[in-house]
Amino acid sequence: MAEAHSALWGLVEEFVVGEQDSRSAEVAAGVKDGIFTVLQVVEALGSCLANPEPRSRAKGMQLLSRVLLECYSRLTEKEVEVLVLFYENRLKDHHLITPHVLKGLMALSMCDVLPQGLAVSVLKSVFQEVHVQSLMQIDRHTVYMIITNFMKTREEELKSLGADFTYGFIQVMDGEKDPRNLLVAFHIVQDIITKNYALGPFVEELFEVTSCYFPIDFTPPPNDPHGITREHLIVGLRAVLVSTSRFAEFFLPLLIEKMDSDVQSAKLDSLQTLIACCTVYGQKDLKEFLSGLWSSIRREVFQTASEKIEAEGLAALQALSACLSRSILSPDAEDLLDSFLNSILQDCKHHLCEPDMKLVWPSAKLLQAAAGGSSRACWKVTANVLPLLLEQYNQHAQSSHRRTILEMTLGFLKLQSRWLDEEDDNGLGNLKEALCTMVFSAVTDSSTQLHQVAVRTLTVLAMQQGFLSSSDIDLVVDHLTRLILQETDSESCMAAIEASGTLAKVHPSVFISRMLPQLCANLQTEPMDINLNESRVVPERFIRQRCLEALAAVSTHQSILKETVPILLDYIGRVHNGEGETNAENVVSICRSLHRVAVQCQLDSEALQFYHEIVLPSLLSLTVQAATQDSGTSCNVLLRDDVLTAMVPVITAACTHLTPELASKSVSQVVALFLDGDVSLFSENNLPSNFQPFQVNGPTELQNHLVSLLMAFVCSLPRNVEIPHLRRLLQHLLSLSLSGCSPFAYSSASKCFAGLINKCPQGDLLDDILQVTAQRIDVGLVDEPSRTRAITLLVWVTKALVLRYHPLSGQLTNKMIGLLSDKQLGPSVANMFSLLVSDSPDIINKACHADIRIMFRQRFFTENVPKLVQGFNSANRDDKPNYLKALSHVLNALPKQVLMPELPSLLSLLLEALSCPDKVVQLSTLTCLEPLLQEAPETLKVHIDGLISKLVSLTLSPAMAVRITALKCILALTKLPLHMLLPYKQQVIRALAKPLDDKKRLVRKEAVETRCQWFLLGSPGS
């Protein structure tokens, strides 16, 4: 015991006299280990704490407070009581001691065993004895933390202080300037208000002590380690200012003043804060200031050049309208919403009638914003404005004016449909005839711009149940059909197709009876003689394409789906039978339409089941028949690579959302078809039984191509769906992948094999298959004729395993890295690294339920980039571009935050990649560099000379994409510190003169912006 006592005294003396700061940690460790107690530490510090020299006393308090910060959770209630009284007394000591006393009090404020009443005692002492704003920032922060800790754990005690607590905190905060402390202080004020601490007579004082920071004007210093932004402070202060309506009488005049200032950021902050206020303030709070608020908002919308400020002004007006709409009116109370809307109508309505229409749009936007606040506001504004707009439409003959008026009408109708659903309540009943006359005349006008607005307006009117009569709906659909089939303007046609898709959900029977027959008739029309066809306004091929798009668009209701899907499949059947045009491009277009229909069905299980049960058998039946018939017939169109590629997403989309029962039933039939030629999936009885898609060479060569459809099916099923005969299927796919079939067939087989491997459960089957696969790939890489097939299989299997973190993925990736030095395969292997880290569009992706682990790219980067760098350094000159290309593909797929820490070690390699003659390497490297350039000035400092030289030379590259991206990189450099760029300013400006005359407009556009920014470097205000 005596030995421990002696050791403690020794440690204390070494800390206080010997200035050995590390001794405080040893003392704290002794307390934690129970070697001595905190009170023994106080006793050991006795002579030091009683020393007449303030610095010695400060040193003693520093040691004690450090120990308390480490050991506060071990203190007993009695120890805490003694220490609190001691520390409160120390607050009266010399100012040098105060910071250390506050640290100790912060430690004590975190003690769970703090006796009742001591929190109040501590805060009273702090408020009375400490002039907080004369302290250093860190010590002021300590005071805020003491208050925060007590507010979390001793709320009721603090509330017993009443308004004295609020007044004490006001004194603490008054004059605070440091953003770190302000964030904490704002949070404390918000808690004082929201947790109902007594404000007493100090409401205005509390407002003043916080509102003096509004609006926030803060720019964080470069490389600020604290990471505090202006936005953090804005959000913190805004939460305070809008936390109580008791601030309204003080804050709203300030808001109006700041909205009228010339500082754009102040306007923006004020408008956004007003929006937040409207969720808390009530009618009585706003009443006195409505006129001033409206004047300020109106001025901003009428006069501002900033779209952002205009948008926030309109949002603020809508928030005011919503706020005034929420209050419940007593019979004798003034309706503030009504009077407020009257003011807006009075100031804006007459602008809608001005002949020059200069202020039409600002006025319409203001009126629509006010109407957007509530159903009551919407009813009043639209009842006043819509008759006026209808009148103006008839008075203006110019299409441009009519379009403007119709667009405004559309805006108000959208508000009507949002707030006022029922016909009896929406106020449009007496305007129905005039509205229909206006819109139907617009949709037949000669102006295509007017057509587009009219179509959108018709859509809004027809979506309101019961508003239009059945004959009106028929007329709407007829107009849409006419625009689709006859309109020369493609945008008007697309607007009609989009509107048809929207309205078909609500009026399916009308579309079935009126639009579908015309679409079907035009789709099946035979191509006419070219001389007879010249009189057609819209070429035949465009009409066919439009019909296909429209059929897909309207397939949003199950009853329509049952009509459109057979029409589309029938067209493919006619191609198969050699009827009409046997055009692969048309079949591809139909497949795109079928794909869109499938995507639209995915959230409707009944529609998806119907689609799946009719489309999958039909496509497989037609293609199997085509593959098993004599070659040379027209049906071979269905076996073309581009047609089968277009069918893949159709089947994929039809299978990704299947129910487990339907998926299991289908997979057994499809696998039986491909493995055994079992045609029971098809309803036809005349199908041949000689379907052998895994047999290589001979008459079945075309059948190999259909493995792409098998891939689309089995690789898109959920992982919990069991694939029957999986081992046998994988063996066949593996053999086909390495056989002498066509590139399309062996690529499809490799992808299908990889997709199944990715989802295959861990176990003997997976281990056996992978072992055999690795061996056969090795053999294939040695055999000259099969090397390309082997590398295709290798990259897909590697991708499948990389995504699921399989142990074998590292071995296969190493094999690919080694092949970068292969003279024959090196360039193609380098390109395949892009496939390893990018998202695959057709298989092994999230939509197809692939096994994809989080952050697989980061893991791939960490494990393999060092190997690529090492391989580059040891490779001969001819092989180095392969390593650079592989590296640039990997880096380009990574998020910026992952790349930044690695940039110093990789930058020299990236610069070397810019000198590589391969355009793919150049573009990939530039794309990777662009977002990083402005983030690492210290790293770039060493390389800036070479970087600028290489980027400037690439602005003259033969490849347009390289020229544009190089210019974007040079533009990104302007964000670097000025001192780094000024020595190169004139060099870059001279070099950028050539891209200004580039033959491509996009390059010239980028060059102009880049050169302007370099011109401005170093100029005032830049």
Swiss-Prot record:
Domain of life: Eukaryota
GO biological process, one term: protein maturation
Pfam families linked: MMS19_C, MMS19_N
SUPFAM superfamilies documented for this protein: ARM repeat
The UniProt record lists the keyword DNA damage: yes
HEAT repeat residues: 858-896, 900-938, 941-979, 982-1020
Spans traversing the lipid bilayer: none
Key words, A-Z: Cytoplasm, Cytoskeleton, DNA damage, DNA repair, Nucleus, Repeat
Chief place where the protein resides: nucleus
InterPro entries in alphabetical order: ARM-like (IPR011989), ARM-type_fold (IPR016024), MMS19 (IPR039920), MMS19_C (IPR024687), MMS19_N (IPR029240)
Cellular component aspect of the GO annotation: cytoplasm; cytosolic [4Fe-4S] assembly targeting complex; nucleus; spindle
Gene3D superfamilies with a match to the protein in the record: Leucine-rich Repeat Variant
Subcellular location: Nucleus; Cytoplasm, Cytoskeleton, Spindle
Family: Belongs to the MET18/MMS19 family.
PANTHER family registered for this protein in UniProt: DNA REPAIR/TRANSCRIPTION PROTEIN MET18/MMS19, MMS19 NUCLEOTIDE EXCISION REPAIR PROTEIN HOMOLOG
Role of this protein: Key component of the cytosolic iron-sulfur protein assembly (CIA) complex, a multiprotein complex that mediates the incorporation of iron-sulfur cluster into apoproteins specifically involved in DNA metabolism and genomic integrity. In the CIA complex, MMS19 acts as an adapter between early-acting CIA components and a subset of cellular target iron-sulfur proteins.
Subunit-structure text: Component of the CIA complex.
Name of the molecule in the record: MMS19 nucleotide excision repair protein homolog
This protein's encoding gene: mms19
